[in-house]
Amino acid sequence: MPRWSIARALSVAVFISAGPVAGQNGPAVIAILPFEDRGSYGQDKEIFRALALGIPATLASELSGHSNLRLADRNRVVRALRSENLGPNAKVDAATAARIAKQVGAHYAITGTFADFYGTFRLDGRIVDAESGQILRVVTNNDPKLQDRAELYRIIQMVAHKLLAEVSPAALRGGTPQAEMRTIPTEALTQYSLGLWYEGKGDREKAGEHYDRAVAVLPDYPEAREGLRRVRGS
């Protein structure tokens, strides 16, 4: 994919959330970076490439719903990722994640990996300290009852909760955002991810088709409807 297409893909799929971190006064900025497919089987490769965008975008939506969190400027992250020549499904090591986090004024970066082995889904999220470059925590869906691809949204939600517990325990005491009380069928989430993928490639028509399919499965899907507004201007 050309670099300009990579930048567009990241601009529609990568978001920033913020939250207070233990031992730190006030809110801390957290940069959510691309996730890497570390070896998935059982579906078209296009779907796995799309999930590399859809998973961090969905994680960001989950984290941004908390009252103690704030959104930082998304464009700074896009520029930082582009300066590192990182695209969707890029492998982001701890040093690179820390460097990007510092560039965008974040205290922490969140990146990770996923793997789908014929329906058994594993999602790992890493918290990287911007100053030291160290991986502070790795969280995952290690509950054997929650490793089925059919429960992908709940898997992402579980990892988001674990990340939040590490970076912002106070946010968990602030109540449950409306977004966390919803459910997103895996088919809708997959179609949304494909919409992000095609939008990033500059194919607005195909992106619109996939966003339409996501909304057909789940009419109350704000992220997919926002995607439709972006690609169709309505």
Region roles according to the model:
Residues V78-A80, E84-P185:
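Catalytic-center loop of serine/cysteine hydrolases
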Residues N25-A94, A109-D116, L136-V138, P177-M181:
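Short beta-strand->alpha-helix linker/helix-N-cap micro-motif
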